[in-house]
Swiss-Prot record:
This is 33 kDa chaperonin. Keywords: Chaperone, Cytoplasm, Disulfide bond, Redox-active center, Zinc. Under oxidizing conditions two disulfide bonds are formed involving the reactive cysteines. Under reducing conditions zinc is bound to the reactive cysteines and the protein is inactive. Disulfide bonds join C236-C238, C269-C272. The gene is hslO. CDD domains: Hsp33. One of its GO terms (molecular function) is unfolded protein binding.
Amino acid sequence: MQDYLVRAVASDGNFRIFSARTTNTVEEARTRHNSWPVATAALGRTMTAALLMGANLKGEDTLSIRVLGDGPLGAIIVTSNAKGEVRGYVQEPQIHLPSTPEGKLAVGAAVGKGHLHITKDLGLKEPFTGSVELVSGEIAEDFAHYLTTSEQTPSAVSLGVLVDTDNSVVAAGGLILQLLPGAGEEVLEILEQNLRQLPHLSSLIKNGETPEDIIKRVTKGIEMKFLESNPVGFSCQCSRERLENLLVGIGKDEVTSMLQEQGAAEINCHFCAENYHFDKKDLQRILKRIEEKD
């Protein structure tokens, strides 16, 4: 099944909900970064949250997320856009921690204490950045805290990544439910009860439930209007051309030094782990471009 995201709104306009299946997206990130289970779960949850929040973006708007904890994972960096594209990496993808007493991956301990920073570039003069302290490092709670405090939109967030014994991703997905002005107590009570009874998202997705099925579970007893659904996936904007322009930008001295010391340059994209090799001829051509520009 292809990964995709669904939007829905209560018929009376009291709340909106976004739900996504991201299994293939998270598995691609795992494969590219060769990440171990706890890093896969942390990165996968963050990427899923980025896609769900990206559902509110338009046109060329972008979203950048930094989870900066003091745990062994280091930083988690993710970007998404209005087209349902996401990319991301974790600073230390190969760490192992014992499971929690409940048998879960110890994502909170791996992330540690710190801050969540979210930057939205909406094409205005300055991007908007909001920051909150991490509540638990489990990612979903941290995003709910951010949306409720920094964006003043009471929100419930559920994110799940299920990893197999061979480290591959079995299921991944998430949902964000946001109350809108005028939401009454009765609706709140129904939603809270439904959310309490909701099984783990990753197990629902593993069993074949779709984002629509999950929305129906969460909103049982409330009339809903389903809006559009859109494909989502891992996509990096890096390219050989972009990195060549980067080399042009660092200047003559740096490129000359690369030529003299290594005779080549190797550049790795953090986001997608793609390697780009520039040999002696490439660097000489780049040097010529710099000289022509100067």
